Amino acid sequence: MAQGAQRKNFGHNQILRPSAAYTPVDEQEVLQILDRHRGQRIRAVGRLHSWSEAVTGDGVLLDLQRLNDVRLQSDGDQLVATVGAGCQIKRLLKELNREGATLHSLGLITAQTIAGAISTGTHGSGRNSMSHYVVGVRLACYDASTGQAIIEELSAGEPLQAARCSLGSLGIILAVRIRCREQYNVQEHFTESRRLLDVMDAEAPFPLQQFYLLPWRWSYFIQHRREDDRPRSRLARLYRLYWLGTMDYGLILQILFLERVARSRRLIRLAFRRIIPAFLIRNWRVTDRSSSMLVMRHDAFRHIEIELFVRRDQLADALGFTQEVIKIAGGRESALSADNQRRIEELGMQEALAGLHDQYCHHFPICVRRVLPDDTLISMASGAGEDWYALSFISYAKPARRAGFSLFASFMARSMSRLFHARPHWGKVCPLEADELTSLYPRFDAFRTVCNTLDPQGVFQNDWTTALLEADGQVGDFP
């Protein structure tokens, strides 16, 4: 055991002050720790890549990085990997690739642990979230009758649906069983369009695509992607170096200079209108392994992020609203369009909009990814119906200079949740009150029931998840 030294998350916007911290070597030690601290609050952490309060805790902290085994097996006609909770995605991909396999769904960041990734609904584009493919969760919790620490296997029904995206609220995840597939290649190329209709029309031939709305230029750069039976391109390695230098590092270094050193809004707008687009090579078609194509070095530099999920039928309105709000926040406009101004007045948010004026200059491409509906209780894409689209807003401002972004993120979350039923990503900045958040999820009551069954004393909660479980927000409560 180590005394609970203070820790910060990746974004330096959350601070953890545990009373005690452990790095157990196996499942048996986890059970021993639970028995030793019976009645105290206990939370697990991964690599702390969450910006939300899901990572916080002032009780006992478990870092499960040593529980990182990977075993790939056939289960009928499917491949299923059993993965230790603390295994990072990058290690998992490497181990699976040795067996000629990979994950169905990948997020941009591979530094996350598997337990952390599924607990917050991590996703890529064009498929379901990672949580959707989970077929079993091995969980340490307490026996309700004896009070002893035990291991539960969740493999069916609502307990499994809850465990697929749990916010760490059911117990301590020890291992995850997740469906895999044979390794495959992805072909990718970029185009640019001024029309969202062109972007959406390209989804049929390129179902794995994601796209970026460039602020201040207001055009869409489309990263067309699809599975490809052809072998890896001869220039794939050169393309990876180009991507690393241009996007993973080059773009962000430009933005860091403009935002943190020059602090010039005029130069930021100029960069997005003229300079950054010049570095994006259009129509260079390259085929490479999926686990290389579908990820980025998104964690190379410290940043903060909010991501909002809207249904397909709300996407066009949501993007139009986004563009107008960014112009107001950046001081380029003083009012929304008549329709959107009326909407804000009906919500009673005129003061919030006025307070945002000229407070924040957005300085990163808005990434939009399509996520298919999930078989979970509370992932952001849970529920049948139309596909979801995740709009990501990132700021590279220094932690001490994030007040403008905080105003922007709060306004966007509050307004878009009411106007477009947008759901904030559980693992990113999540500024809504508990009642508002739970009202966005029709099956939150079922999730609450599973939590209360597996953790009746609430020992695996922090203040934030406790507030969520105690909230009485019902679907439709908020306009």
Swiss-Prot record:
Q: What does the record note about the cofactor? A: Binds 1 FAD covalently per subunit.
Q: Please list the cofactors this protein needs.
A: FAD
Topology relative to the membrane: Single-pass membrane protein
Any GO CC annotation of this UniProt entry = plasma membrane
Range of residues in the leader sequence: none
Record-linked Gene3D superfamilies: 3.30.465.10, 3.30.70.2520, Uridine Diphospho-n-acetylenolpyruvylglucosamine Reductase, domain 2, Vanillyl-alcohol Oxidase, Chain A, domain 4
Enumerate the transmembrane spans. 241-258
- Record-linked InterPro entries: ALO_C, FAD-bd_PCMH, FAD-bd_PCMH-like_sf, FAD-bd_PCMH_sub1, FAD-bd_PCMH_sub2, FAD_lactone_oxidase-like, Oxid_FAD_bind_N, Vanillyl_alc_oxidase_C-sub2
Q: How does the annotated pH dependence read?
A: Optimum pH is 8-9. Shows almost no activity at pH 5.
Residues the record lists as binding FAD: T113, G116, T120, G121, T122, H123, I173, R369, H425
Summarize the protein's role: In vitro catalyzes the oxidation of a range of fatty alcohols having a carbon chain length of six and above, with a reduction of O2 to H2O2. Shows the highest activity with 1-dodecanol. Is likely involved in lipid metabolism.
Q: Which family does it belong to?
A: Belongs to the oxygen-dependent FAD-linked oxidoreductase family.
Q: Which PANTHER family match?
A: D-ARABINONO-1,4-LACTONE OXIDASE (PTHR43762:SF1), L-GULONOLACTONE OXIDASE (PTHR43762)
Name the UniProt record assigns to this protein: Long-chain alcohol oxidase
What organism is listed for this UniProt entry? Uncultured marine euryarchaeote
